Every structure is written in structure tokens, then in C-alpha cells.
Amino acid sequence: MSRGIIIIGSGFAARQLVKNIRKQDAHVPLTLIAADSMDEYNKPDLSHVISQSQRADDLTRQLAGEFAEQFNLRRFPHTWVADIDADAHVVKSQDKQWQYDKLVLATGATAFVPPIAGRELMLTLNSQQEYRACETQLRDAQRVLIVGGGLIGSELAMDFCRAGKTVTLMDNAASLLASLMPPEVSSRLQHHLTDMGVHLLLKSQLQKLEKTEAGIRATLVSQHSIEVDAVIAATGLRPETALARRAGVAVNRGVCVDSYLQTSHPDIYAIGDCAEINGQVLPFLQPIQLSAMYLAKNLLGGNAPLKLPAMLVKVKTPELPLHLAGETQRRDLSWHITAESDGMIAKGMSGEGQLRAFVVSEDRMKEAFALLKTLSV
């Protein structure tokens, strides 16, 4: 008798995988195990909850029971997996164990919190659970410090500013989105945030946080300090690899998988934010959707290597939205930038004259798909 497929996790990657499996096989036993409630919500919405006055419960799209019934699966919410015996094909919690034929790790990623004095005062917004734990504090806060000027930090800074809060955005780098694009490209967003009233502290490093009668004192390495009501860490995500390590599966930055989404153990796979696919961590929706399509085939006996096309990444900053694609982080590209009142097109060209990356904003975003077709990958 088939022991079926076990998926650890209940986020976007896990749900996409379930849907793709059920498109091909209505009967293979499916089991979902996760530490949270398993209710569905749209994680990107967390970047806009404050300006839209949304509570954590407002984000719920589908209850876990409805999903389980719709897709014919067993579910074990609020369950912490303690160990995986890869040789015996057994997943263990403190009081239960499950046997599997194939196991999928969809354990996601956790928000990195800088290891500074007072780090316990920092909030993170990487899940509905995390938002639920701090929504009252964030709603009441008037002065907000966001640590990290990447995608999430920039999105949150705009959202809190649109909600009428006093926002300070801090980053070690000299420009926003520094790991994604050069400053001459990100400067349009940077200037817009400043015009909105966001106070930028670039080339700045946080040293410590202290609770005071007035709120929280944030002290920089430079000894400059500011008083705020809330501090949010937006300093990146770390793939959740602890279970994979305990199972004896190869791990680097994420859980190492090949083009078949297979780990170093032939019956264990990984997908989503926890996975490192041929050396790349790709925590974006489109690669996860494609991964789910291919992995479903492979779990059901197929042999389909994942092929990822050039893909758009969307920066969800509504007053100055951006789309980017290609190797925008490459330092050897020559950037050709056309900036007008209705938007910007920035093209990253190689020494051979090939289009290797681009960033478009505002009304020029409609040109993104045409540019994608000419992108060299």
C-alpha cells in the first residue's frame, strides 16, 4: 500500500504543489504537516497592511479545513516536526510519526534579526502569525524605524509613510536595493521615498536598542540615536534548513536540490524559500509556481528537469512601482537609463552589447514583457 507524499509546510509553495499534484492524481495519499494554522493568506499583502488598515485575520483567504477537503489530504496544523529518519522514511513529531514514500520540505525561510543588544525589541513581518503578534503595536506606533533597505524594507517604508507615520529607513549600504541594482538605477525610488517624508539613514549600522519611557532608543555605531515607537527588521531571510540537516540532507545557504528539486537523498525534495536550486535561492512567486509544476510531475513518477525562463521581480511600492529582470546585481554591466516624468527604463548591457538586465518603473512597466523577450539569459 502506498504511504504517499508528505509535505512539511503550508505556505505558497506547499499549496501550489498540492494543487499541481491533484491535477494529475486525485488519489495518491497526501499529508501536510505544519507549525502554523495552515490557513491560506497572501504573503505579499504584508507589505501593505498598515496603509490599508488591515488586521491579521483580514488576510485569511481560505481556512485549512476547506483546503484539505477540496484537495483530499490529511492535515496536521500546529505540529512541530522534531526529526526525520530518512533511511526508514519516517517523519516524527513529539507524539506522532508518519511514514512516507516521498517527502517534500517546504519549510520556508525565517526573518534574520541582527544580533545586537536589544534585538528582542525588533519586530518581523514575515508571516501572518508574526503580524498578528505585533499588529497593535504597529498600528499604535507613530515613529517607526525599519532596518534594511532591500525589497521588503523599501516596501514597508512606503506603506508606513502612506499611513501617516514618521518613518526612518536604515541600511549599511550607500543606496537602497543595493544587492539588486546599482545606485543610479535605484535612485528614482530613493528620491521618491525622501520626497514622501521617509528619513533615510544610509551607510549606517545599528548598534543597540533600549526600552525608554518614551518608546525605544535606537543607537547607531556612529553614536547617533533616535527615539521610535517600533523597530522592524527587514534585513533578509534565511532559508529554514534545520530539518534537512537532521535528516542528513546536504545544505548550503538553503536545502540543496538539483533541477529535479531532489535533495542528496533520493526520496526527499525541497521547494520554495527553503530550497537552493543548483546554487540559487529564489524566494519569488514565479519560480515557486514553476517549481511546483515540475516537482508534481517528478513525485508522480516523471523525470522533468526544471527550466526557469527570465522572470520579472516586482517591487511593491505603489507610488513608484518597479519591475526588474535579469542579472541586475552584476557590477560589470553598462547601464543605459532613460528617465522621464512617466517612468524610467534602465537597461544593463554587457561588453558584447547584449541586454543582460533591465529595470522599468511606473508607466514604462508596460514595456517589461517586450524587454523580457530580448533578454540574454
From Swiss-Prot:
Flavoprotein among keywords: yes
Organismal lineage:
Bacteria, Pseudomonadati, Pseudomonadota, Gammaproteobacteria, Enterobacterales
Listed under GO cellular component are: cytoplasm
The EC number on file is 1.18.1.-
State what this protein does. One of at least two accessory proteins for anaerobic nitric oxide (NO) reductase. Reduces the rubredoxin moiety of NO reductase.
Q: What is its main location?
A: cytoplasm
Q: Which family does it belong to?
A: Belongs to the FAD-dependent oxidoreductase family.
Top-level enzyme category: oxidoreductase
In Swiss-Prot or TrEMBL terms, this protein is called Nitric oxide reductase FlRd-NAD(+) reductase
The answer to keyword Cell division applying to this record is no
Catalytically driven reaction(s): 2 reduced [nitric oxide reductase rubredoxin domain] + NAD(+) + H(+) = 2 oxidized [nitric oxide reductase rubredoxin domain] + NADH
Cofactors that this protein relies on: FAD
| Cellular compartments annotated | Cytoplasm
Any one GO molecular-function label of the UniProt entry: oxidoreductase activity, acting on iron-sulfur proteins as donors, NAD or NADP as acceptor
Pathway membership, UniProt: Nitrogen metabolism; nitric oxide reduction
Alphabetized UniProt keyword annotations = Cytoplasm, FAD, Flavoprotein, NAD, Oxidoreductase
Check the record and name the InterPro entries matching this protein: FAD-bd_OxRdtase, FAD/NAD-bd_sf, FAD/NAD-binding_dom, NO_rdtase_NorW, Rbx-bd
Gene name tied to this protein = norW
